Amino acid sequence: MQNKLLDIVENDQLRNDLPEFKSGDNIKVLVRIKEGAKERIQAFEGLVIAIKNYSTHKTFTVRKISNSVGVERTFPLNSPVIVSIEVLRKNKVRRSKLYYMRDLKGKSARLKELKK
């Protein structure tokens, strides 16, 4: 009984407007940021290095290099602060978690683009 009620509530909060993406894809995430009374939209563009699946609590981690410093940010997929997600490039990878990309620099950190 309890699980059915939770499923109904969680299914109402699912988002269907986001595109399909997987680990290894380059994406741009537009995030709504509220600072005091002001609200703005900030873009975070980078490589998806991990997707963690747990029903409606799905999260994904995006990594980018900013001023030669690696920055990682984890987003809940069904979060209302995410305005949109745009897939910029699909890459060919053979792993679901790309944590080894943290140690790579320069040309060794490149991934092959998936051919259509």
Swiss-Prot record:
InterPro entries per the UniProt record, alphabetical: Ribosomal_bL19 (IPR001857), Ribosomal_bL19_CS (IPR018257), Ribosomal_bL19_sf (IPR038657), Translation_prot_SH3-like_sf (IPR008991)
Keywords: Ribonucleoprotein, Ribosomal protein
SUPFAM superfamilies: Translation proteins SH3-like domain
Single GO MF annotation: structural constituent of ribosome
GO biological process: translation
Any one of the GO CC terms: cytosolic large ribosomal subunit
Similarity section: Belongs to the bacterial ribosomal protein bL19 family.
Role according to the record: This protein is located at the 30S-50S ribosomal subunit interface and may play a role in the structure and function of the aminoacyl-tRNA binding site.
HAMAP family, per the entry: Ribosomal_bL19 (MF_00402)
Protein name (database record): Large ribosomal subunit protein bL19
Source organism: Mycoplasma mobile (strain ATCC 43663 / 163K / NCTC 11711)
Gene that encodes it: rplS
